[in-house]
Amino acid sequence: MAFIGKLFNALRRSRDRVSNAFQQLVKEKVSPQSLEQLEETLLASDLGLSTVEDILDIVKKHSHENFLNEVADYMQQSLDQEKQLEIQTPSVMLVVGVNGTGKTTTAAKLANYYVDQGKKVLLVAADTYRAAAIAQLQQWSKRLNVRMVCNENSQDPSSVLFDGLQSAKSEDIDLVIVDTAGRLHTYTNLMNELEKMARVVSNRFPEFNLISMMTIDANLGQNSLHQAREFAKSVKLDGAVLTKMDGTARGGIVFALKNELYIPVLFVGIGEELNDLEEFDHQEYIRSLLGLEEAEE
C-alpha cells in the first residue's frame, strides 16, 4: 500500500526520536537516567502525560524482557475502536476547527472519499466570512463533479446550511459535507454560531444524522488538545482528521485525543491532493511510530 510508505515518512520526526530512545534504552539497560531521557522524548512527541506515565510503568515492569512489544500492545489497545465511522443515510457532517488547520481542503477530501464509497454527496460552503474559502471549495466541487451550495450574499452560516439541507432533501443526498468558518476556540460568538448550526440540523432536519468532524493540525501538539477540549463544549465531536502530516509532524496527539477526550482520529491527511486522505490505521501508525517495520513501497 502506498499509504504505508507515506505515513512512515510523515512520522519521520517522531519515529526517529522515539525508536532511537527505545533502542538506546535497550543498549544502556533501564535506569533512572535512561527512563528520564525516554520520558522527555515521549513528551516531546506529544503523547500526553498519562500515556507517557503508563509507558514508563510498562518499561519498568518488563525491563528484563522485550518491553518494546509490550509498549506496542499497550498503544494499540489504547487506540482501539470498534469500527470506522458509519455514515447513516442521510447524514450531515460539519467540518470544524481552528483557522489554518485545512478545513476546506479536508471537506473536499472527505467528499472525494465518500463519493468513492458510493455515496451521493453535496458540499455546503458555510464559511461566509472568507470568500476565498467559497471559491476554493467551488473549484474542488467541479473537480469532484459534486454539487455545491453557497450564498455569497449571506453572512449567516446557518442560513446557508438550511438552504443546503433543503436541497439535499429534494435530491435524496446521502451525505452533506459542510465547510464551516475557522474560529478560535476563545471566540464566544463564533462558538455560539456553531451551536446554532447544530440546532438547525436537529430541530429543522431531524431526519439527518449529525456528525461533527474536527480538523487537527498535527504540528500544533498539545495546543490542539486544548482546542479540541473547547470545541467539544459546543458540539459533540465524533472524530478528528489529523492534517498536515509531513516529515516534521510529531503525531503523538492521537493518544491524548482518544484517552483524555474520547475523540478518535478517523482520518489522516498526508498531502494536498484529493486522494491524500486515508482512514487512520492505528496499528500501522504505532508500528511506524516505533519503527517496528520498514516502510512498504
Residue ranges and their predicted role:
Residues 112, 182, 220:
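Active-site proximal helix/loop that lines the substrate pocket
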Residues 178-184:
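Short, flexible active-site loops
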Residues 1-11:
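Disorder-to-helix initiation segments
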Residues 96-97, 179, 215, 269:
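Short beta-strand segments
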Residues 157-171, 185-290, 294:
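Conserved catalytic-core segment of NTP-binding enzymes
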Residues 9, 13-128, 133-169, 173-178:
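Primarily NTPase-proximal linker/entry elements flanking Walker-type ATP/GTP-binding cores
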Residues 126-128, 180, 218, 244:
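Generic detector of well-ordered alpha-helical packing
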